[in-house]
Regions:
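Intrinsically disordered, low-complexity regulatory regions enriched in serine/threonine/proline
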Residues: 1-14, 26-139
Length: 139
């Protein structure tokens, strides 16, 4: 188990590229006891949620396409994009050089437990997905 403060700190560290490379702003931090944690980033067209349910050991990264600066209906699969689906689309288009460069970006990050490794893996996947985001056909 990870406590809320440690989760938020880890996500902010691993996903710092969202602010630096994509000019997204940290929009929300939620720590609901020891059960649910969420860190969200936002720009004018999308919001990204990195959430974790401690009891279920469930990590989830979702990109929401905004409409009039509001989140779309969660069930709208064209506007609520789960990282695992995007990752499978991107891996078929990204070349080895892009993947290697992306992995190099994250070399300095330390991970000492399973959850932090999964958070880091999600950060790597999201960064690569965002590099190809406008090329993806999401329907």
């Amino acid at each position: 188990m990870i406590d809320g403060k440690e989760y938020v700190r880890t996500v902010k560290e691993y996903f710092a590229f969202l602010e630096v490379e994509y000019n997204m702003r940290l929009s929300d931090e939620v720590v609901n006891g020891s059960f649910y944690y969420d860190v969200s980033y936002k720009d004018k067209v999308r919001a990204i949620s990195i959430s974790y349910e401690n009891a279920e050991d469930y990590l989830q990264v979702i990109i929401f396409i905004l409409h009039n600066n509001k989140l779309a209906n969660y069930d709208d699969k064209t506007k609520t994009l789960h990282l695992n689906r995007l990752n499978s689309l991107v891996l078929s288009t990204a070349n080895k050089s892009e993947i290697d460069l992306n992995n190099e970006y994250f070399l300095g990050f330390e991970t000492e437990n399973g959850l932090k490794k999964r958070i880091l893996k999600s950060a790597k996947e999201l960064r690569l997905c965002l590099q190809h985001f406008n090329e993806l056909s999401i329907t």
